Amino acid sequence: MQTNNSKEKVRQLQNKLYLTAKKCASRRFHALYDKVYRDDVLFEAWKRVKANKGSSGVDGIGIEDIEAIGIEKYLTDIKAELADGRYKPSPVKRVMIPKPDGSKRPLGIPTVKDRIVQMAAKIAIEPVFEADFRDCSYGFRPKR
């Protein structure tokens, strides 16, 4: 798995997708799935998930465990599962967190593996949707 320059390669991919979507608003993207399991996209997704920290999911595997296994091997395994159509998300770990009024609300914690795949999917589809959003719309948008 080649991870050199992943941030720049991902930025170029996103820019290309954005410009294509912006140029032709009626354009439909039918082949984004293969972008999700690109080496650079998965590595960038890993870096973003790692930066967010967070607890392990139902599998009990945390960031440190993945680093001990070997990041390259872990991401290569995810890539193979995605490419072969074998990837299945795990159930989320349910924990109750306190609210200001003293009651509790449920929180679902996905596995780190699922968070990596979710982030990779976000990296691939975000520029396509970003091209259609209005400039006056700010909610949950990067750098807005």
PLM segments and residue spans:
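Conserved pre-catalytic core of RNA-dependent polymerases
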Residues: 2-144
